[in-house]
A protein has these predicted regions:
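Bacterial N-terminal signal peptides
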Residues: 13-20
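Substrate-binding cleft/loops of secretory-pathway carbohydrate-active enzymes
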Residues: 125-137, 249-263, 323-359
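Mature extracytoplasmic enzyme cores
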Residues: 30-45, 50, 65-76, 80, ...
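Bacterial Sec-dependent signal peptides at the C-terminal "C-region" and cleavage site
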Residues: 22-30
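Aromatic-lined carbohydrate-recognition surfaces of secreted/lumenal glycan-active proteins
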Residues: 116-123, 241-248, 300-336
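Alpha-helical scaffolding within the catalytic cores
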Residues: 33-41, 65-69, 334-342, 369-380
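Conserved small/polar residues in nucleotide/adenosyl-binding loops
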Residues: 388-392
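Bacterial N-terminal signal peptides that target proteins for export
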Residues: 2-12
Length: 392
């Protein structure tokens, strides 16, 4: 795991529940740990220590709705809210009306002493900006995100449709993609890889989810999502709007092994050998399969860090904002959705985890509510980095 250097001196722990609650940080300050002070703050905590719900907008939002709901939040002891668009939303996402209502919410929050935070997506997973990213940047989704394997004894007549064709020769594999016709009558073991693509859906605005491993996708996402907030709030981003929440960003395969256009190039530069002719070792236990799988997963993780986490973190640093949220279910030991979650936490100003449902389960490593492992991963990442005072 590659993280920012040094360790923080202190950590206050609190649960962040992405399904309904989130706690958030105040600016670093000298703290007195006297019991009387702690007891007083437990009885009437400042808003930085109070929960903040995901405030769902899933209809036509009105100022009267905002007045009523923020009033309810204040009455129930909340410290703020994350405006969270969900399916059913009639108010157009990122429209002038959206930002007018958002600004009204922030002003009302000031009156009530509530912090209004940004949830950075139209539902989830973060990255596609409600369909605007794929609409404006086709290469964010149309190049393929997986390689599906077909094994044959002879190259098929339509071998040209495959992205990569390998022939097994002893304990190694030869790339015959450019010359499959030569082997049409040569029996053997052939490994044929075809590109797969994320499927389109209404959830993603009629497009598909985007490939966060493609360079420039995160920057496009930030430009589309945050430009309206920048125009509307200017210097209030940071001091007033404390930060933003990313929900479930992920890098799953669209079918077969996870692939992205420059994966082979990045892999060779990092490890000094060809991943293309080693792809069968990702599904078969032969040769140096353990090394190949480790190198492959480490490459995906580092690409995810470099092309998603670092740009997001840098943007929030520039704006003086806190970046929080969580990744897709952090379901270790499965690496299907994103590799090493702890490596991702290191780039958040306020790292967090999901705690779905309300049924305690300390048995399954994939459990959400009651998952001690996930909490310890999060705390360890906070302790190992220089994020300063944190609530996790």
């Amino acid at each position: 795991m590659k993280t920012k250097p040094s360790a923080i001196k202190s950590l206050l722990a609190a649960a962040l529940a992405a399904s309904c609650l989130a706690s958030y940080a105040a600016a670093p300050q000298k703290r007195e740990m006297k019991f009387e002070k702690l007891r007083k703050e437990f009885a009437d905590p400042p808003r930085a220590f109070r929960p903040a719900p995901l405030w769902v907008w899933n209809t036509r939002v009105t100022r009267a709705d905002i007045d009523r709901m923020l009033g309810d939040f204040k009455a129930q002891g909340f410290g703020g809210a994350f405006v969270h668009p969900r399916p059913g939303l009639v108010t157009e996402y990122l429209s002038d009306e959206w930002f007018d209502l958002y600004k009204y919410s922030v002003e009302k929050g000031k009156e009530l002493g509530l912090d209004i935070w940004i949830y950075d997506e139209n539902s989830y997973p973060s990255g596609f900006a409600g369909g605007h990213v794929p609409a404006q940047m086709p290469e964010s989704y149309d190049q393929g995100q997986g390689l599906a394997l077909t094994k044959t004894a002879l190259p098929p007549a339509d071998a040209g449709k495959y992205f990569l064709c390998l022939k097994k020769e002893g304990g190694t594999f030869r790339d015959i993609t450019a010359d499959t016709g030569r082997y049409k009558d040569v029996p053997g073991e052939y490994y044929l890889y075809e590109k797969t693509y994320y499927g389109r859906s209404g959830w993603h605005g009629g497009y598909s989810y985007v490939d966060l491993l493609v360079e420039g996708v995160t920057e496009k996402f930030l430009d589309i999502t945050m430009s309206g907030y920048e125009k509307t709030f200017g210097n209030e981003l940071g001091p007033v709007i404390r930060g933003l929440f990313s929900d479930e960003p992920c890098i799953p395969s669209s079918g077969g092994v996870r692939w992205t256009p420059d994966l082979f190039e990045v892999f060779r530069k990092q490890w000094g050998y060809d991943l293309a002719t080693s792809l069968p070792l990702l599904s078969e236990q032969t040769g140096d399969w353990k090394q190949v799988r480790h190198n492959y997963l480490e490459t995906l993780t580092q690409m995810f860090v470099d092309r998603w986490a670092k740009p997001m973190s840098a943007y929030c640093d520039r704006k003086g904002m806190l970046w929080t949220g969580h990744y897709w279910e952090h379901d270790w030991p499965s690496m299907y959705q994103g590799g090493d979650n702890m490596a991702m936490y290191a780039w958040h100003q306020m790292p967090a985890i999901d705690m779905l449902f309300n049924q305690y389960n300390d048995q399954s490593p994939q459990a959400q509510f009651g998952n001690v492992r996930a909490v310890k991963e999060l705390r360890s990442a906070a302790n190992q980095t220089e994020i300063g005072r944190a609530h996790v």
